[in-house]
UniProtKB/Swiss-Prot annotation:
GO cellular component terms given for this protein: Golgi apparatus; Golgi membrane; membrane
Disulfide cross-links: none
Known function: After transfer of sugars to endogenous macromolecular acceptors, the enzyme converts nucleoside diphosphates to nucleoside monophosphates which in turn exit the Golgi lumen in a coupled antiporter reaction, allowing entry of additional nucleotide sugar from the cytosol.
Gene: gda1
Primary localisation category: Golgi
Segments for region (Disordered): 34-55
Glycosylated position list: 318
Lumenal side stretches: 27-503
InterPro entries: GDA1_CD39_NTPase
Catalytic residue list: 194 (proton acceptor)
Record's protein name: Probable guanosine-diphosphatase
Superkingdom classification of source: Eukaryota
Membrane association type: Single-pass type II membrane protein
Reaction(s) the record says it catalyses: GDP + H2O = GMP + phosphate + H(+)
């Protein structure tokens, strides 16, 4: 009996073993991977401390978006982490890194014919992305590169070669999905988009958009190296005669924006060639042109120190200026600009800065700000709401102790003090690093005069108008990058997860 039972157990064990062998034999040699909807990460890693599931089950709980700002003076990356715990994405974290500054700029445009070198210049930024995006999210974290005014000025042929090289390197070296060409994944960003994205960033962080309340929005003035942008939501007074109220005129300046369930009718314009570095070049060039007109035959003055009222007193600056083909000084000249020996020449510098604005240009659609560009009057259509000025506006005022909010009259006083030279700088002694900044930058007087001219003479803001400077709001970087990254969280933004089967 015991032997029969033992035989039965042996037979049963043999059958089970055979079944296991058959299952192993028919199973696939590679593991099967589930498919994921377009734009969703292939991971179920939980959010840290916010919530355990997304508000919308069609969206992933956590999303990363990468944005490279290829500016005229350098390139910067923003690595954003969002959660979808609520009806709209919430920014949880941001990592920011920029290329090392170098003479002549470290932007993509500085590489000119070396397209591959330009593409490789982004590698340090991508290393930051590789370190800060967890491996399980990399294949579903979209990246876009937006070049601004500097590359725009390089011309269509050279700039396109650089853009193609950048796309190729990102697609072949790194695991992140690159936004498609059709959706502007690697492109020279249109100036109107640049300004509007900055407006979205600012008002999103201020909590003025994206929520249920229709609160008044803030204006945004962004001063870059090659261009400056203005974006605001004008409010037109009702007609006194009882007719239809005035509206924003049709044209390229009008930007209709749908965001967070609201419609915004914005005025925007990007003034190409009116960034701070472009303004410096224009002012220095105007001085050289005046000298050339006075002495067109004898050019020995080029080797002598050239007086410049926009250089600080008893300071000098070596400047390289390029001239177009056919110009007597083409292709370039190197000169030494020197400031006055004593006293302030702020008024003279202000005059040179105002001339660059071309206020006398024909205005085909009134009213105009400068250079013949239509703009609704800020005093009439945006008199009371907040005005945020950032980028170089911030960089040239905050180090000198300006508060987060000040009037244009206070900016005018600062400009006069700075242009007065070392004898006037005693008030900066108590501000850490201010005196070193002033002594290291002979063009401080020029920079502040251009800013003052742009805001007061160009945009026609009264001296009593208050402006706010900021580099961050709620500890988040300002600029256009966040505003441009928010749309990337949508499934229709031009990318799919880069999911590969494991061999």
């Amino acid at each position: 009996m015991a032997q029969t039972q033992r035989s039965r157990y042996l037979k049963t064990g043999a059958i089970v073993a055979a079944l296991l062998l058959m299952l192993l034999w028919i199973s696939p040699s590679r593991p099967m991977h589930p498919s994921f909807p377009q734009g969703q990460p292939s991971t179920s890693a939980p959010a840290k401390g916010k919530c355990s599931k997304p508000h919308d089950p069609k969206k992933p709980l956590i999303q990363y978006a990468l944005m490279i700002d290829a500016g005229s003076q350098g390139s910067r990356i923003h690595v954003y982490r969002f959660n979808n715990c609520g009806p709209s994405p919430e920014l949880e974290d941001e990592v920011f890194f920029q290329t090392e500054p170098k003479k002549g700029g470290s932007g993509l445009s500085s590489y000119k014919e070396d397209a591959e070198g330009a593409a490789k210049s982004l590698d340090p930024l991508m290393e930051v992305a590789m370190k800060n995006v967890p491996d399980e999210y990399k294949s579903c974290s979209p990246i876009a590169v937006k070049a601004t005014a500097g590359l725009r000025m390089l011309g269509p042929e050279l700039s396109q070669k650089i853009l193609d090289a950048v796309r190729n390197r990102l697609e072949t070296v790194y695991p992140f999905p690159v936004v498609s060409k059709e959706k502007g994944g690697v492109e020279i960003m249109d100036g109107s988009d640049e300004g509007v994205y900055a407006w979205i960033t600012t008002n999103y962080l201020l909590g003025k958009i994206g929520g249920p309340d229709e609160t008044p929005t803030a204006a945004v003035f962004d001063l870059g190296g090659g261009s400056t942008q203005i974006v605001f939501q004008p409010t037109f007074p009702k007609s006194k005669s009882g007719g239809m109220p005035e509206r924003l005129s049709e044209g390229d300046h009008k930007y209709d924006l749908q965001f967070g369930g609201r419609h915004f009718e914005l005025y925007q314009h990007s003034h190409l060639g009116y960034g701070l570095m472009a303004a410096r070049k224009a002012i220095h060039t105007s001085i050289i042109e005046n000298m050339l007109a006075s002495s067109p035959k004898d050019l020995s003055w080029l080797k002598q120190p050239i007086p410049n009222p926009c250089i600080g007193p008893e300071m000098e600056k070596n400047v390289t200026l390029e001239f177009p083909e056919g110009h007597k000084l083409a292709p370039e000249v190197q000169v030494t600009m020197v400031g006055p020996k004593v006293g302030s020449t702020a008024a003279q510098c202000r005059g040179l800065a105002e001339k660059t604005l071309n206020k006398e240009a024909a205005c085909t659609l009134a009213p105009c700000s400068f250079n013949g560009v239509h703009q609704p009057s800020l005093e009439k259509t945006f008199a009371r709401e907040d005005v945020y000025i950032f980028s170089y506006f911030y960089d040239r005022t905050k180090p000198l102790g300006m508060p987060d909010s000040f009037t244009l009259d206070e900016l005018h006083q600062l400009t006069s003090t700075v242009c007065g030279g070392e004898d006037s700088w005693g008030i900066f002694a108590g501000i850490e690093g201010a005196l070193k900044e002033l002594r290291d930058r002979p063009e401080w007087c020029l920079d502040l005069n251009f800013m003052m001219s742009l805001l007061h003479t160009g945009y026609e803001m009264p001296l009593s108008r208050e402006v706010k400077i900021a580099k961050k709001i709620k500890n988040r970087e300002l600029g256009w990058c966040l505003g441009a990254s928010l749309p990337l969280l949508s499934q229709e933004s031009g990318w799919t997860c880069r999911i590969k089967e494991v061999s």
